[in-house]
Amino acid sequence: EIASCLVGSEMCIRDRSIGNTVKWTVVNLVVQLVAAMLLALALNQKLKGRSVYRTLILVPWAVPHAIAAMTFTFLYNANVGIINILAVKLGMITESVSWLGNVGSAFWCVILVAIWKGIPFQMIFILAALQGISRDVYESAEIDGASRWQCFWRITLPIIKEPLAISTVLNLIGIVSCFNTIWLMTKGGPLYSTEIVYTYAYRRAFIDHNFGTAAAASVVLFIFMAVFSGVYLKMVSEKE
């Protein structure tokens, strides 16, 4: 399938970018949501040094996309990257791997960076919502014999569902519109394995000078972003 994209199949490249966009969005959204929820629940407990942990977790969010992309590109480097050095020493691989130059691993290496940067954003929303729940509610539930799992499903989740939904939509907009990380790390390669609709539109417009195709892809992206933005605005207005 990938090889056929190299022989000029515009439809194949376009379809692959759409498929990658869907996979990129779903994996990012699910992993970031679950990880953010777990971290927020942990930081909502009375932990020693909680403020330090909170600050450290927020660091990825504060790092600019360009800095994060360059840093991880260096870490993934086949010759001097720390990931290869550690993996070889631990016996996980026998020789250095070009992680970003390999069709099978490039997509997952880039998505790992996006997940690393995206988790803190959603965690802030969830943690803020959790801190608004009175401890008395949980104490009453525990007296009635409710387990922690039951408290989460019957108390926590219903109370934070609105801010959780809003943060998820905002995160979704950021995930779908992500361009910098992919372009700086792989430019959609190798062999279009990390190509998403945004990089596809950029390539067609500014490299291939095919402005018609780029404009069509941009219109589709605009429609999706408008829908997500509309959902977000509706949620905010209903909450108010």
Where are these regions (language model features)?
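A structural signal for multi-pass alpha-helical bundles of membrane permease subunits
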Residues: 4, 9-10, 14-240
